């Protein structure tokens, strides 16, 4: 009761509105290559920040609950400069190409962050899935999705099957919003 009284008597006259809050955990844009301008425009148009540098397990393992010691701990490697354009082309064509940036419902389907990483997998030796498989597309992050290819896939060139898999995963958000808004019946 005393605590309530002392808190309620504090002078709040100096409290004003917050002008701007920056939730970005990364430097953005992440460079000054041609694709960085494209990524910056995507952030302005869509509200989705594409991140490809300095993504580590602390970012990949943010979640709503506290994990058990046997849960996966996601790890990755940073894509090369040559890889970034491959990732970005897929994002532009298959994810953003199926959405309408003038529709707020479409923008709401996208994550705050899209991590472009190589070799995403489970790095927890206590986990049942430890280094057993590569994770191509992860959509269950707290505020992010991640798109990943293995270094070998990128070096050999993406096969039509791999591109098809990404296209199918990326088409889901646009289909979902079209059905929810009854644009598709």
Question: Where are the model-predicted features located?
Answer:
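General structural signal for secondary-structure boundaries
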Residues: 76, 80, 100-106, 155-162
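C-terminal motif of bacterial Sec signal peptides marking the signal peptidase cleavage site
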Residues: 4-8
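Auxiliary, metal-adjacent structural segments of Zn-dependent hydrolase domains
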Residues: 83-142
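Generic structural motif recognizing short loop/turn segments at the entrances and edges of beta-strands
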Residues: 46-47, 58-62, 108-113, 140-145
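Short loop/turn segments at strand-loop or loop-helix junctions that form parts
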Residues: 63-69, 117-119, 146-150
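Acidic/polar, low-complexity intrinsically disordered N-terminal segments immediately downstream
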Residues: 9-98
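Active-site recognition of the HExxH zinc-binding catalytic motif
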Residues: 143-185
């Amino acid at each position: 009761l005393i605590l309530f009284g002392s808190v309620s008597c504090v002078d709040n006259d100096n409290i004003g509105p917050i002008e701007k809050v920056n939730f970005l955990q990364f430097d953005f844009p992440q460079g000054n290559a041609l694709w960085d301008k494209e990524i910056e425009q995507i952030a302005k148009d869509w509200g989705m920040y594409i991140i490809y540098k300095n993504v580590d397990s602390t970012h990949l393992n943010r979640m709503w609950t506290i994990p058990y010691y046997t849960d996966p701990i996601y790890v990755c490697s940073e894509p090369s400069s040559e890889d970034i354009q491959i990732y970005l082309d897929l994002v532009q064509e298959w994810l953003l190409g199926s959405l309408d940036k003038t529709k707020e419902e479409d923008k709401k389907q996208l994550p705050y962050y899209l991590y472009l990483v190589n070799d995403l997998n489970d790095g927890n030796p206590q986990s049942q899935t430890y280094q057993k498989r590569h994770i191509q597309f992860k959509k269950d992050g707290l505020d992010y999705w991640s798109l990943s290819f293995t270094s070998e896939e990128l070096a050999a060139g993406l096969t039509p099957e791999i591109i098809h898999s990404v296209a199918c995963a990326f088409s889901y958000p646009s289909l979902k919003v079209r059905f929810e808004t009854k644009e598709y019946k």
